[in-house]
Regions:
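A conserved mid-protein helix/loop that constitutes part of the nucleotide-sugar donor-binding site
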Residues: 13-18, 187, 191-210
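Conserved acidic donor-binding segment of nucleotide-sugar-dependent glycosyltransferases
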Residues: 300-313, 321-327
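Aromatic "clamp/platform" in nucleotide-sugar-dependent glycosyltransferases that forms part
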Residues: 268
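Short hydrophobic beta-strand element within catalytic cores of glycosyltransferases
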Residues: 285-288
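Glycosyltransferase donor-sugar binding loop
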Residues: 32-37, 192, 218-233
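Donor nucleotide-sugar binding/catalytic pocket of nucleotide-sugar-dependent glycosyltransferases
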Residues: 49-50, 133-178
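Short His-centered aromatic/hydrophobic patch
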Residues: 82-90, 108-109
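Nucleotide-activated donor-binding/catalytic signature segment of Leloir-type glycosyltransferases, i.e.
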Residues: 232-250
């Protein structure tokens, strides 16, 4: 049995459900996650166990105890696969004094808020580090990263010495994505993601403001506030946002992303940007902040440009020159590369090799 653990049910739905479905003929999967908005969509798992944790709290003691109780009686033949750095930290704390029973894998899909530049994050890193260094080598057999920079930073921080893998992406179901056939006469620019400061939402609004007098371009935001993340904008900031751009809320990406022309990803940090892969596959021109989790996508797929230091003026310059890039996009070539390297099938095959070695 393979146990997928995540501190948010959306994580076990997004990409991981597709992986579970792809490997269901080889393995059985149980999800351990707090059941929230996505509880009725987690149908690909053989079973879902409700992890009773309040993810809006920094440390929820009851949640740590509940996770401990769920994993302490697992069998030696079972495998645990943890998703996200936050879940890994919660797992390490909750299992501090437990005897290790299972083969345990952790996917760090991005370093997130903990490795941001905020003062609170810096303090948290200092406080949590002794716990991580003490238990990570004892309790984790394999760490999976999505880019080299995240690997280097976290290995130095944690002193992890066991097996390390680089797997770029979480698996894209390319069969669901509607393909773009033509570009709009009035260019539609879109930001897709949670409305977090760390995702670059404020930089995006500055970019949009630079085109406030232009009648040949429109700016959209698709996503929502995340109350469980300290980087999230608040309701007051959301109301201001609605006055500056066209706010869509959450959209059905597979069926709606193709309606737009240009995807902006000004995120401060990414593991391996899923929305960039989706935008590139659909056929959008993509511009992103030059970070480890976006650079390789843009470079390998040749689907747009990266911007150093999230420079708003450079974004504006590239957007103004958009037509010459759009005219030269080879979306068929992009799609073939994504299928080969970043699809659900490609990532499932990598996971399958790791799972087979755990049995």
């Amino acid at each position: 049995m393979i146990y997928y653990i995540a501190h948010w049910d959306w994580i076990l739905l997004q990409s991981r459900s597709e992986i579970v479905r792809s490997l269901s003929d080889k393995f059985q999967f149980v999800g351990i996650t707090p059941l929230e908005k996505n509880r009725n969509q987690l149908t690909d798992y053989d079973e879902i166990l409700n992890w009773k944790i309040n993810r809006q709290r920094l440390i929820d003691i009851r949640g740590l105890i509940d996770l401990r109780n769920k994993v302490k009686n697992l069998k030696k033949t079972d495998t645990i696969h943890i998703f996200t750095l936050k879940t890994l930290i919660l797992f390490l704390i909750s299992t501090l004094l437990l005897k290790k029973q299972t083969y345990t894998i952790a996917s760090i899909t991005g370093l997130g808020y903990l490795f941001s530049k905020t003062r609170i994050a810096q303090i948290l890193r200092i406080i949590i580090r002794p716990v991580i260094k003490r238990s990570i080598n004892k309790n984790i057999d394999v760490l999976i990263f999505q880019n080299e920079l995240n690997k280097e930073i976290f290995i130095e921080y944690s002193k992890f010495k066991n097996r390390i893998e680089i797997i770029e992406g979480s698996g894209l179901n390319t069969n669901k994505l509607k393909i773009k056939s033509t570009f709009n006469k009035k260019t539609k620019v879109i930001f897709v993601g949670r409305l977090l400061k760390e995702k670059g939402i404020f930089e995006y609004l500055k970019i949009a403001k630079s085109f406030s007098d232009s009648d040949d371009i429109e700016f959209y935001v698709a996503g929502d506030i995340d109350g469980g993340n300290k980087s999230s904008i608040n309701n007051k900031e959301l109301e201001v946002l609605k006055q500056q751009v066209m706010y869509l809320g959450n959209i059905d990406i597979p069926n709606e992303l193709f309606k737009y022309d240009l995807l902006i990803n000004p995120s401060h940090h990414e593991g391996f940007s899923r929305v960039l892969l989706e935008g590139a596959y659909v056929g959008l021109y993509c511009i992103a902040n030059d970070i480890a989790g976006t650079r390789n996508i843009i470079k390998n797929l040749d689907c747009g440009f990266v911007v150093e230091n999230n420079n708003v003026e450079k974004y504006v310059e590239l957007i103004k020159k958009r037509q010459q890039v759009i005219d030269n996009l080879d979306s068929n070539k992009v799609r073939n590369k994504i299928i080969q390297n970043y699809s659900v099938e490609a990532i499932s095959n990598r996971f399958k090799i790791i799972y087979n070695k755990s049995w």
